[in-house]
Amino acid sequence: MFFRFIILLLSFNLASQEYEITSKNIEIDTELNTINYEHNVVFKSDDIFFTADKLKLNQENESFIAYGLPIKIKFYDGIEFIEGEAEKIEIDSEVLKLSKNVSIIKAGNKINSENMIIKLSNDKS
């Protein structure tokens, strides 16, 4: 089924962390247990914020794959918030993967790569 919304706000729980997703369009596939968000996607949680063109949520394992030209992202690496961009982002409960034209700024230094893997810390203490 395909539903078209001007703005869709949904809250879920990812590894005991709440998040909110906003987009113009949503497609829910109950057979595959997936939700696809398209157009002006905004993902917000305590540790990760990004804007993308598309986002696919797999509800079985609570993993995400986002696409954009580029995706703008801000995330907490356990020490500080880091800003950057990439064309593809994959998130599961423990790992943030950025790929295709990755560029981040950490501690004032710009880092460029084709692929980057960041282990997420669920503990801010």
Predicted regions and their residues:
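N-terminal signal peptide c-region/cleavage motif recognized by signal peptidases
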Residues: 11-12
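Sec-dependent signal peptide recognition
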Residues: 1-8
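N-terminal amphipathic/hydrophobic interface segments
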Residues: 16-125
